Amino acid sequence: MNPLASIMITLTIILGTMIVMTSSHWLLVWIGFEMNMLAIIPVLMKQHSPRAVEAATKYFLTQATASMLLMLAVVTNLLYSGQWTVTNITNPLASAVMTLALVMKLGLSPFHFWVPEVAQGIPLSSGLVLLTWQKLAPLSVLYQISHSVSPTLLLTVSLMSIAVGGWGGLNQTQLRKILAYSSIAHMGWMTAVLAYNPTLTLLNLTLYILMTTTTFLLFMFNSSTTTLTLSHSWNKSPMIATSTLTIMLSLGGLPPLTGFLPKWMIIQELTKNESLLLPTLMAMMALLSLYFYMRLTYSTSLTLFPSMNNTKMKWHLNNTKKVPLLPPMITLFTLALPLAPALSTLY
């Protein structure tokens, strides 16, 4: 891609997201969504392969449909309230349609169908943007309207997303699809607590983005896209391979790693609100995600696939890539659980 075009596309993506996050007028929010969607399409298609074009087309159709539903809800609310203000939603039907539109943009169940397919058809760098940065704009709008959204609808969507995120990843060998289903499950956890403590959703989002970014950087360092190529990374860089598996267990929420912290705090918050059945179901379904991460760890570390490279490290296998940010990121996002008391005072 032309460097100048790449800079312009990146700035447009950032600007579109910033417009959505800082606007209080629905028309500006819609414009920000459209800017972001149109700018991300070339990023998804930068490989110029049929699979990438297919993924970009699926992404475009889904996001365009969600934007149409969002404008339908906004106009419906305008007819009843006469206002374009984001936080002023008076009509229950408009609130429900608006929530479903944002759920579709986030890729939550039952509108999760596009996330694994799009993530699988694009390169790792584009997948990183899709599963992290692209969550900011819809979730910020959902955060602003959380006071007028039906808690029952949010909890139903969150439980379905956690279940789909766990079940969907069980039979996968493609790392991008595994991370896509993990994203669906994590978004389910965020929406579950949104009606009770929206600020806790921001903590979960921050930790999710940082852990997912670290995981993608490790995969890009190893050039790993499947469990087979991930198992071969032991011969090239054993420490990086070990770190990759540790951060993936953290994504699964295994204590005492960092990924356990947001789940712990969300279950605690739901219990405070006299909701016992919901956190119990969420904790049980979270075991599905943890299971496929532990199975992945076992298959890539304790067993080795048949390969000509299962020998001692050779000079031609030495990895010359240097990523200075990886060591502190790996350390922080696997061993940050002792920060829980400090974070609990903030959230």
UniProtKB/Swiss-Prot annotation:
The keyword Transmembrane helix applies. It holds the Pfam family NADH_dehy_S2_C. It is an enzyme of class 7 (translocase). The chain crosses the membrane at residues 13-33, 59-79, 96-116, 122-142, 149-169, 178-198, 201-221, 247-267, 274-294, 323-343. The keyword Membrane applies. GO terms for molecular function: NADH dehydrogenase (ubiquinone) activity. It is found in: Mitochondrion inner membrane. Keywords: Electron transport, Membrane, Mitochondrion, Mitochondrion inner membrane, NAD, Respiratory chain, Translocase, Transmembrane, Transmembrane helix, Transport, Ubiquinone. It is a multi-pass membrane protein. It catalyses: a ubiquinone + NADH + 5 H(+)(in) = a ubiquinol + NAD(+) + 4 H(+)(out). Disulfide bonds: none annotated. It comes from the Eukaryota. Its EC number is 7.1.1.2. Its main location: mitochondrion. GO terms for biological process: mitochondrial electron transport, NADH to ubiquinone; mitochondrial respiratory chain complex I assembly. InterPro entries: Complex_I_Subunit_2, NADH_DH_su2_C, NADH_UbQ_OxRdtase_chain2, ND/Mrp_TM. GO terms for cellular component: mitochondrial inner membrane. Coiled coil: none annotated. Core subunit of respiratory chain NADH dehydrogenase (Complex I) which is composed of 45 different subunits. Interacts with TMEM242. Belongs to the complex I subunit 2 family. Core subunit of the mitochondrial membrane respiratory chain NADH dehydrogenase (Complex I) which catalyzes electron transfer from NADH through the respiratory chain, using ubiquinone as an electron acceptor. Essential for the catalytic activity and assembly of complex I. This is NADH-ubiquinone oxidoreductase chain 2. It comes from Megaderma spasma. The lineage of its organism: Eukaryota, Metazoa, Chordata, Craniata, Vertebrata. The gene is MT-ND2.
